[in-house]
Amino acid sequence: MAILYHYPMSPYSEKLRAAMGFSGISWQSVVVPEQPPRALLDGLIGGYRRIPVLQMGAQFYCDTRLAFEALHDGDGGAFQLDSGDEAFREWAESEIFFAVFSACSSLQVLRFLHSQVGLADAIRFVRDRMGMMKNATITPLGRKSAAIQIHRYVADLELRLASGCFLAGDSPGYLDFCCYHPLWMICHLDKAASSRWPHLVTEWVARMRALSNNEVATASPEAILESISGDDTKPLETVEAPFRRGDRVSVAPSDYARDETIGELVVLNRERIVLSRGLDSGQLIYVHFPREGFDLV
């Protein structure tokens, strides 16, 4: 059983919610606070703060690409893209993702946050995100530049959607889920945004949004521990030099939200880093990170 640690207004969570809805994957929900501390999740995976996190038994995936692969039984082909599509995905999930927030006014952002979490938590959220970006290695675009980038992005989407209902063709694929969630976020921040988009794009967004409208049960703390206990998989693979299996290391994103997770190194290869962490219950869990975009010390 998949367990998703998420919160309603998280764009990357929406990416996985839509993917699981389309695939008909049964999953359970753990709704976490919009910003740390998150007592339950922190106790499992340490300092890593990005959301969502996907749990499959004793395996915890701290990246939506790794999570997508795990949901498809390790089938790497499920998210393989050609070079042109991969470049478009990278643009969507990096520059466009951040442009979404830069293109909106502060009033729009605060109004949305207030509607979701109330005034006090909205203020805490903004302060948290400002602190999160202090040691970031990325530079957000100005509002005008961000709006121009989003306009270009929507225009490119229209061209790509001219030949099918989805970017992948007749049914959604990995590229659809990656490119959808930035526009999903824009629609929440700016209610009038979609009225300015071509109908091919608005209809595609509506089709994608419908995929995540599935009811799920809440995972109890007991169910979480039971899921861990029922998984005896130990991902003991290659550890590339100069590191050795069992080294106590820290892993953190290299661009933003650079809080670290500490554990024992069990996998280090070209694609991923996996740490083992012991819980107070005596159980072991395995926390998976992508190799690209993360620092290992």
Predicted regions and their residues:
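Short, flexible, glycine/charge-rich loop motifs used to bind or transfer phosphoryl groups or to couple energy/partner
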Residues: 43-44, 167, 239
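GST-like domain detector, emphasizing the conserved glutathione-binding G-site
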Residues: 1-124, 140, 243, 253, ...
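N-terminal short leaders/motifs
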Residues: 1-12, 206-222
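Sparse recognition of residues in long alpha-helices and their boundaries
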Residues: 193, 224, 278-279
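GST-like fold's C-terminal all-alpha helical module
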Residues: 92-206, 210
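Mixed-charge, Lys/Arg-rich low-complexity intrinsically disordered regions
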Residues: 213-245
